[in-house]
Amino acid sequence: MNDVSKASLPKAIFLMGPTASGKTALAIELRKVLPVELISVDSALIYRGMDIGTAKPNADELKAAPHRLLDIRDPSQAYSAADFRRDALAQMAEITSAGRIPLLVGGTMLYFKALLEGLSPLPSADPEVRSRIEQQAAELGWEALHQQLQEIDPVAAARIHPNDPQRLSRALEVFFISGKTLTELTQTSGDALPYQVHQFAIAPASRELLHQRIELRFHQMLASGFEAEVRALFARGDLHTDLPSIRCVGYRQMWSYIEGEISYDEMVYRGVCATRQLAKRQMTWLRGWEGVRWLDSENPDRARKEVLQVVGAIAD
């Protein structure tokens, strides 16, 4: 697409960043001074009843700056990147038609990528094929299936851990249904996003600062009742650790503690470590991201001014 046709597209803003980087606070500040509406880009914030451990904006924050695509699924339900793209495009169109600018804020980089570049034409899930894979796993173990994937699609096998049955079975399922590997199919992109996107990433200047923020926030969550929140989910009886919701960072570790698998101190240690690992993955995505402007989360006022310098002109 040339620059002239790109300039005629509606505007959108991406505000990306690792967990605990201050994205939400900045987005709320920006909404006070720009004609923007916020859309959450977070695979954990979609779940109802999961507020503390996901650092969901509180009632006052949501009153000041409503977020779309929050609380749209029960923790028992799945939600894919394709679901997100469909929902986000609908919300963006609604915001644009009202004469405002969509501001997409979050840290689920796969969702941002799916929205920006479109999705690969992957086949839909097939319950029969999935059942066959699960039966094989029950007989041979997931390690054997991982070796099978290694022969079929070594690139995907290198990315997928043998202890990740959901992604492992999906990679095999795609091959059994289509005859093509996940790697082959994901190299074919779908439709690009029909918006002129201004992309920002916010993060502390150093990894140590981010690690401190993560640890502090995890302890704040515990003080705010995170254990009680997860116990309420556990008490439902229909949730388990194979669900994406319960595999969310912090929830998986708290679940292990509630089940008596680990001690409280071990839960805290693992929860902080898992959150740091998540932040590391998010930063790896962002460092390879094209066309992004970096903001320093330790200087929120300056970050806000930098966004306004770029976006102020398009918002007029």
From Swiss-Prot:
Catalyzed reactions per annotation: adenosine(37) in tRNA + dimethylallyl diphosphate = N(6)-dimethylallyladenosine(37) in tRNA + diphosphate
Q: Domain of life of the organism in this record?
A: Bacteria
Q: Which Gene3D superfamilies match?
A: 1.10.20.140, Crystal structure of tRNA isopentenylpyrophosphate transferase (bh2366) domain (1.10.287.890), P-loop containing nucleotide triphosphate hydrolases (3.40.50.300)
What are the UniProt keywords, alphabetically? ATP-binding, Magnesium, Nucleotide-binding, Transferase, tRNA processing
The site feature described as Interaction with substrate tRNA is recorded at 108, 130
Q: InterPro entries per the record?
A: Dimethylallyltransferase (IPR039657), IPT (IPR018022), P-loop_NTPase (IPR027417)
Q: Which GO molecular function, any one, fits this protein according to its record?
A: ATP binding
Region Interaction with substrate tRNA: list its residue ranges.
42-45, 166-170, 247-252
Q: What EC numbers are recorded for this enzyme? A: 2.5.1.75
Residues binding ATP, per UniProt: 17-24
In this chain, substrate is annotated as bound at 19-24
Cofactors demanded by this protein: Mg(2+)
GO BP term, example: tRNA modification
What HAMAP family does UniProt report for this protein, alphabetically? IPP_trans
Q: What does this protein do?
A: Catalyzes the transfer of a dimethylallyl group onto the adenine at position 37 in tRNAs that read codons beginning with uridine, leading to the formation of N6-(dimethylallyl)adenosine (i(6)A).
Q: How does it assemble?
A: Monomer.
Q: Which NCBIfam families match?
A: miaA
Q: What is this protein called?
A: tRNA dimethylallyltransferase
Q: Which organism is it from?
A: Salmonella paratyphi B (strain ATCC BAA-1250 / SPB7)
